[in-house]
A protein has these predicted regions:
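Charged, solvent-exposed interaction patches on well-folded alpha/beta domains
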Residues: 1-162
Length: 162
């Protein structure tokens, strides 16, 4: 009771930047909080776009089922050193499935839903290490993970191996 005031400040760490269907931008953190965008600072995190339907920025918490799935997949990416370095964008398709855009390579990853998420990422990591390192990062247009136990790739139409 000596008149001292103690303040504890905890900075929220964003794991993704969301741009919803209506163009509203905000960050999300691991605790399912929405964080307003700052005009003075940008955090390097994956950008999430696509069919994210919600109203205006009126709630500070993630509440819709689509956003809960976004949180699940972006939390996994954020906490995995390999995928955090690889994934640049996460897009939500109209049916709620995910399409991942990597930083390296000129392909998209049709991830599907978050069911068996860890297994899908594990198989994709093996494919990156044992497949793409031999065939090249630009051979495929699409890598599809939404088939149980399989990775299906579509070659680029005009791909020519050097």
């Amino acid at each position: 009771a000596n008149g001292d005031l103690h303040i504890k400040i905890v900075q929220k760490q964003p794991i993704a930047r969301v741009i919803n269907k209506y163009g509203v931008n905000y960050y999300i953190n691991e605790n399912a909080n929405k964080i307003p965008i700052s005009s003075k600072f940008t955090t390097r995190v994956p950008v999430v776009t696509g069919n994210i339907q919600e109203g205006t920025y009126n709630s500070n918490m993630i509440e819709t089922p689509v956003l809960k799935n976004v949180l699940t997949i972006t939390r996994f990416i954020h906490n995995n050193t390999f995928w955090n370095a690889q994934i640049e964008q996460v897009s939500v398709a109209d049916n709620g499935s995910f399409v991942l855009i990597p930083k390296l390579g000129d392909h998209k990853i049709e991830f599907g839903g978050i069911d068996n998420m860890e297994e899908k990422f594990h198989k994709l990591e093996i494919f990156y290490a044992e497949g793409l390192s031999y065939t090249g990062w630009d051979k495929y247009e699409t890598i599809k993970l939404d088939y149980k136990g399989q990775i299906v790739c579509e070659k680029k139409i005009n791909y020519e191996q050097e």
